[in-house]
Amino acid sequence: MAKITQTMISQLLAAVGGSSNVSKCGNCMTRLRLTLANNGVADQAVIKQIPGVMGVVESDEQFQIILGPGKAQQAAELMNKLIESVINGDVQEQAMASDTNDLSSVAAEQKKQMKSKQTSAVQRFLSKFATIFTPLIPGFIAAGLLLGFATLLEQMFVLEQTPSQFILDLIAYMKVFGKGLFAFLSILIGYNAQQAFGGSGVNGAILASLFVLGYNPDATSGIYSGMSEFFGYTIDPRGNIIGVLLAAIIGAQVERKVREYMPDDLDMILTSVVTLLIMGVVTFVVIMPIGGELFKGMSWLFLNLNDNPLGAAILAGLFLISVVFGIHQGFVPVYFALMEAQGFNSLFPILAMAGGGQVGASLALYFKAKKDAVLRTQVKGAIIPGILGIGEPLIYGVTLPRVKPFVTACIGGAAGGFFIGLVSYLGLPVGLNTVFGPSGIVAIPLMTSHSGIFAGMAVFVVGLLISYVVGFLATYFFGSKDVDLS
């Protein structure tokens, strides 16, 4: 696979319209995420021809370039440095612009095409979830892995024998990071959410803290807020992540509106004060009760879907499509709801089956292709990340461009999801021990169940194998016909 080089980044920057068209440059695990002043200027055809680019996803405010695992962050750093150099006059963009086939001449045509495929309001909304949750994913994974290893040590050395004090201390040490993360996670999410929707992150963090504080003066745990009611109104901090998101999103809109009317000289002093006073009332009186009911309803819906083999198959089968559109982060609030309802995330292993179907489909294409085919090289470069749980290189480099294998990959994922749902229906739901984590084989030590981690790990592995096999067979016999295998 192509390396991230200065030349490649220069070509990408030119193809999206130059530094003047890039308002913000960031990344997630596999994608370079750009906020462009004018999406119509970006030449997708040119971008897709640049070596190392696996695909392009446009989601209203974000223009996403898929580069693969381990490359997106490097690309974002190089592009930000290049943009800064251009702004400072250290680098001229003239040389870069020559590679774009006169972007200004095609901008008008591109703009017309973009207007014809406007994204939906739902897609625009869900795309912001990547901005909120992507920075938190490394912490979720780290806390989940440490908790998984701690639980494994517990089951091996604590439950059936007298452990040493060192083992007990080690287990407690590995668990403390997860407890710290989940104790204050709402505040981190509130900060990111309000910032993502155009407000000040610190105001979102303060609003989120209202859900963390305690309102019972007699409670023996937590941090007492100093108030047990709000002007005679009983405070019930329900809603969890749903309430926090609602408060931050609405808070961002209120803050922006207040700033419109606030004199510039008073903006820094009073805008946040007025915003918090307004949003405190809204949060205590409206958001907490409504958020609580929404949270309860979401938990009920997905608990029933996860315990139903058909529902689980549908969720797993459609998940790859949500990845293609870049809206898969929209499931994260559901993960929180399930963590609170079950003690683990039972949706994640179902959705992870989609990656298994992708691996099976890609292996089938590998064996169908001739020994000197470029397709084999593409599969070789992307199969290991796919097995480890990062499926975008396989999606954009192997299956999606050929369409049929993408469909059969979805079928493979659905088969694995059906198995996970069936086992849950029979009385053994399994799930991730943290909100979010890696999929693929890396997720095995993070699996758990009410019958222990070994049962959870075993069910997940069998489901993954089913996805591999069904994805392989469906693609080998049906998904590779009339498909470019060169």
Curated annotation (Swiss-Prot):
Cell compartment(s), UniProt: Cell inner membrane
Enzyme kind, highest EC tier: transferase
Enzyme Commission number(s) of this protein: 2.7.1.192
Regions crossing the membrane: 129-149, 170-190, 196-216, 230-250, 268-288, 312-332, 347-367, 381-401, 411-431, 453-473
Topological relation to the membrane, as annotated: Multi-pass membrane protein
Gene3D superfamilies linked to this entry: Glucose permease domain IIB (3.30.1360.60)
List of catalytic residues: C28
Gene Ontology cellular-component terms listed: plasma membrane
Alphabetized InterPro entries for the sequence: Glu_permease_IIB, PTrfase_EIIB_Cys, PTS_EIIC, PTS_EIIC_1, PTS_IIB_1, PTS_Sugar-Specific_Components
Catalytic activity, reaction form: N-acetyl-beta-D-muramate(out) + N(pros)-phospho-L-histidyl-[protein] = N-acetyl-beta-D-muramate 6-phosphate(in) + L-histidyl-[protein]
Main localization, broad class: membrane
Span of domain PTS EIIC type-1: 127-486
GO molecular function: kinase activity; protein-N(PI)-phosphohistidine-sugar phosphotransferase activity; protein-phosphocysteine-N-acetylmuramate phosphotransferase system transporter activity
NCBIfam families, alphabetized: PRK09586.1
Family matches, as PANTHER family: PHOSPHOTRANSFERASE SYSTEM TRANSPORT PROTEIN (PTHR30175), PTS SYSTEM N-ACETYLMURAMIC ACID-SPECIFIC EIIBC COMPONENT (PTHR30175:SF3)
Annotated domain remarks: The EIIB domain is phosphorylated by phospho-EIIA on a cysteinyl or histidyl residue, depending on the transported sugar. Then, it transfers the phosphoryl group to the sugar substrate concomitantly with the sugar uptake processed by the EIIC domain. The EIIC domain forms the PTS system translocation channel and contains the specific substrate-binding site.
Function: The phosphoenolpyruvate-dependent sugar phosphotransferase system (sugar PTS), a major carbohydrate active transport system, catalyzes the phosphorylation of incoming sugar substrates concomitantly with their translocation across the cell membrane. This system is involved in N-acetylmuramic acid (MurNAc) transport, yielding cytoplasmic MurNAc-6-P. Is also able to take up anhydro-N-acetylmuramic acid (anhMurNAc), but cannot phosphorylate the carbon 6, probably because of the 1,6-anhydro ring.
Stated name of the protein: PTS system N-acetylmuramic acid-specific EIIBC component
